[in-house]
């Protein structure tokens, strides 16, 4: 699947496009890309976006320091607070040498701080140029993980309710099954068909971003575009009906959603109190206690024509950027660290086995994450992956 999953994501990245103007700072940095600054003088400060992989990055950083002697500091922003944290950290004298943007919209705010990676070994390891964001000829950022999301489900509970995955081929089927489970929840020993759709900061991104991607994707697809200044809202009624299903066939009263958290949803799913849980491949470590053979994944159906051929949502919102205001030694240390992460046995094993990542680099290891195996099967079966178009959303306030 590496090839299949990466191809699906490439479509999403290409659809979002990039800016066309180049900056003096990024152009000037290309010469320094080949510099051989002494490692002993350099250090790395990574401002990580993904809280669920914080410990994995801490461990990998410690291993790199043990092997090379180069100090690597990893700081992880709180969920939903990355942009605010980045703005604050970049004002400091010891600013991050490595940070992230979520795509073209995020890059627009930070491109003047992005070192040109076009001459770097890291860029040379990419399996496709589609995974790089550019500003003119300068490579400003590089995607480092390809992820997939949908509706994770408990096979045992679905079977106990009298259904199998083949019974759910669209929104109407999903609603029929969920409504039935909700009506029989006491009999089945669950609290609801779906886990709570918590709207606090640890969980709301699943719905205001990932779920909202579906109507945007279908509007872009219908109009043959990759971005727009303003959506028409063609599929907002479809968005509403899947959201309504999430909150009516839920483990909790809709009045409680504002206070429900991501941890609540995980506890409900792992505790076998809900059959369905919207999340992605990155959530495997949270749900693995159910057993690999007990995990399934459905597309997020919203009731559009032809959705029986729809697959899962595949793409990236994680792009590495190297801070061009850092010292030459720190820039080189950061480039060396990234190259080690995506080429060494230690780095690629950690990203595949511990973080559960599919990475778009030549030496990537096949992931043991069963949710990724499921995602690959959808592609192998000819299902159409849904591109990640939410990176074109203008801001958190817009959401």
Place the predicted regions along the sequence by residue.
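C-terminal capping/gating helix-and-loop segments adjacent to ligand/active sites or protein-protein/ligand interfaces
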Residues: 143, 314, 356-363, 373-399
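A structural signal for short loop-to-beta-strand junctions that line the ligand-binding cleft
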Residues: 89, 96-97, 123-158, 192, ...
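Short, solvent-exposed loop/beta-turn-alpha elements that line the ligand-binding surface or hinge
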Residues: 116-130, 193-194, 198-201, 216-241, ...
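Extracytoplasmic/periplasmic solute-binding protein
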Residues: 140-144, 149, 175-228, 274
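Hinge/lid segment of periplasmic solute-binding proteins
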Residues: 33, 102-153, 206, 296-298
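Conserved N-terminal structural module of periplasmic/extracytoplasmic solute-binding proteins
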Residues: 3-12, 16-19, 23-106, 119, ...
